[in-house]
């Protein structure tokens, strides 16, 4: 019987995929197809929630099949992320206008990312205090116990590592290993490796311009191929969003969410407030924040459903260049740095809120100014090297909690609402990187304001 029901669910999913394909054949815009997929995915997931239990075998098996589309799409994006970072960063160095302001551009982008992460930590602290979020009374079930075991294993490798050692881990000892994403800090290690190649290119360009020009032409060819691969993968975005949203909604435990409702509410209030701060920073830079919101919404939608900052990177770069008018070099830097440095959601708000929740359980007053200032500083510093894939928030939280000498068990106790909160965190991460790129480009006079201010006519070109 279960097999029949699973077959029906999968058949409905395939019909919905067929509808999206029909819309594509009728040249319906990319935005409309993505939003249609988002809405239909939520509706389908809610229907499955109503008919079955989230933990039922039918839902579990159906979600496994849905994952072929949703998770398969995310894996394709993750497949291209490391090559894209490597080629994008090196390509940024080969742009003449970038080499003149290299230190200023990279410093400004990183500075904005770290600053906004510190602000995000303060927002998370305020939300925790305002909603009186506490770890008291949280119960540990089977899922939490299993998660706690994994967290403790991961903590063992982090606990004995000092802050200088953590910073040393950012340096790539084997760049080819890091290109596989084998370490939590692999992303930023690839960024550093690519930056060294770029700096070497600048030196070669001064002494041996012919060899440098040959390298540049080869790199341009590789970059064109990588971006073509990105385009091919991005065509699948509506289908991926449909499956991911249906899977997430269908598998969500409503009862568990209600038990941690205060934490979920406080988290989303903090995320929304921080997103508004992004818009305020854009407005203070002399740009229309509504225009920004309209142009990046499809990217944020995908980040929300996929829960992968790294997976959203191709869309991130494309949106910065084609929609916001950000120069290619700055867009490449901002997107690449943004998946490993200063993630406002995963490395900012989340660790700060967990620290505020657990501090009273060990006799610490979380509202003491000294504790708050120390926590903000630790969060900002610890935001270096957080992976832009699943588990990055856990890694950031473990570093912050261990540095503050706080219990790490809280990380496991909120597992039931982790997927729900992670969607919002990821969207904020991506918004933070695009905000850093936009503000940097504006301040350095490299923003094409005509592109930024014009109506969004290029949306469909992302998947063309």
From Swiss-Prot:
Topological relation to the membrane, as annotated: Multi-pass membrane protein
Keyword Transmembrane helix in annotation: yes
Cell location: Membrane
Pfam families: SDF
GO CC list: plasma membrane
Predominant cellular place of this UniProt entry's protein: membrane
Molecular function in Gene Ontology: L-cystine transmembrane transporter activity; symporter activity
Spans traversing the lipid bilayer: 3-23, 34-54, 73-93, 107-127, 184-204, 225-245, 263-283, 347-367, 371-391, 395-415
Top-rank taxon: Bacteria
Entries under PANTHER family matching the protein: L-CYSTINE TRANSPORTER TCYP, PROTON/GLUTAMATE-ASPARTATE SYMPORTER
Family per similarity comment: Belongs to the dicarboxylate/amino acid:cation symporter (DAACS) (TC 2.A.23) family.
Role, per record: Mediates uptake of L-cystine, the oxidized form of L-cysteine.
Name assigned to this protein: L-cystine uptake protein TcyP
The organism of origin for this protein: Bacillus cereus (strain ATCC 14579 / DSM 31 / CCUG 7414 / JCM 2152 / NBRC 15305 / NCIMB 9373 / NCTC 2599 / NRRL B-3711)
